[in-house]
Amino acid sequence: MSMVVQQEQEVVFDAAVLSGQTEIPSQFIWPAEESPGSVAVEELEVALIDVGAGAERSSVVRQVGEACERHGFFLVVNHGIEAALLEEAHRCMDAFFTLPLGEKQRAQRRAGESCGYASSFTGRFASKLPWKETLSFRYSSAGDEEGEEGVGEYLVRKLGAEHGRRLGEVYSRYCHEMSRLSLELMEVLGESLGIVGDRRHYFRRFFQRNDSIMRLNYYPACQRPLDTLGTGPHCDPTSLTILHQDHVGGLEVWAEGRWRAIRPRPGALVVNVGDTFMALSNARYRSCLHRAVVNSTAPRRSLAFFLCPEMDTVVRPPEELVDDHHPRVYPDFTWRALLDFTQRHYRADMRTLQAFSDWLNHHRHLQPTIYS
């Protein structure tokens, strides 16, 4: 088993070998101005919000609104996700990422697609590669009723019954629960933006039929952690992210002009706003730049659920959020168009939504019948 295989200028990331190497391939070394360096990172003060049945609704709405106005990140507890399911989801993640590289590559992600196994971003980019492996798959809330391939069927098809069946059972339940929680949070977000009364269910209904993404992240230990990143600085292009971290820290958020850490808290889920919801809120709430760092002693794992609308649903803010003082900031678009942009044309960063809007306006000008 070799550390790096060079085939047509493409690097293969083998975590089982690379994690013990004192030198790392140059493709994983980030520029000094972007790498973590040796500066100590302080912890970010993040709201810890009880969203349980007994929580006072007005307090939850207020805390969520304040968090989104500050930096877009908050923690939720008493969220209704059973601890046993979270633990089993992490066990299944361990089972997958400890498979031999060849077994994991049975689910290899194809160019231009958002689902499958990815060992770093090899094949997509040639520099500033992230120090991680991922397994991503689609979750459709309407999958069962429309006969679409579900999470379980996808994982069995890609990994075979031996490895895929148990993962499929666990992550089908996990995604269902994440979708449920996402819809509850969407209703809270709407209320915090002033969408109340008969319209308070607006965002819940918008995402009721969602076409979301589930991602398992594995960040191996690295003997040069100050020179690389587990995930580079970016804003999520999706609508809402719900993250469960293991006990190893690594998530950092750009807030108050510097990088700040969000430490893991047992039982808590990390929630943040993405670019698509930023557009839906007419930029009242903004997606926040964040990254993941690695360390030299312990691997880090996380489970990320990315709430997304159905592919061809038009993303535009509700009428309550557009007025003379708040004119439209972004053009109408579909999630399919934004997803395709990030997979084929643009590497997600802090400017993704603006770059996409500029690209969309340019192409609509050139070919209005196609992009209108």
Swiss-Prot record:
Keyword terms, alphabetized: Iron, Metal-binding, Oxidoreductase
Class of enzymatic activity (EC top level): oxidoreductase
Other noteworthy facts: Plants over-expressing GA20OX1 have high levels of bioactive gibberellins, and exhibit an overgrowth phenotype with increased internode elongation and leaf sheath length. Plant silencing GA20OX1 exhibit a semi-dwarf phenotype.
InterPro entries: DIOX_N (IPR026992), IPNS-like_FE2OG_OXY (IPR044861), IPNS-like_sf (IPR027443), Iron_ascorbate_oxido_reductase (IPR050231), Oxoglu/Fe-dep_dioxygenase_dom (IPR005123)
Active site: R300
Enzyme Commission number(s): 1.14.11.-
Cysteine pairings via disulfide bonds: none
Protein name, entry field: Gibberellin 20 oxidase 1
Catalytic activity: gibberellin A12 + 2 2-oxoglutarate + 3 O2 + H(+) = gibberellin A9 + 2 succinate + 3 CO2 + 2 H2O; gibberellin A53 + 2 2-oxoglutarate + 3 O2 + H(+) = gibberellin A20 + 2 succinate + 3 CO2 + 2 H2O
Induction: Negatively controlled by the level of physiologically active gibberellin.
Database matches in PANTHER family: 2-OXOGLUTARATE (2OG) AND FE(II)-DEPENDENT OXYGENASE SUPERFAMILY PROTEIN-RELATED
Name of the coding gene: GA20OX1
Job description of the protein: Key oxidase enzyme in the biosynthesis of gibberellin.
MF terms in GO: gibberellin 20-oxidase activity; metal ion binding
Organism of provenance: Oryza sativa subsp. japonica (Rice)
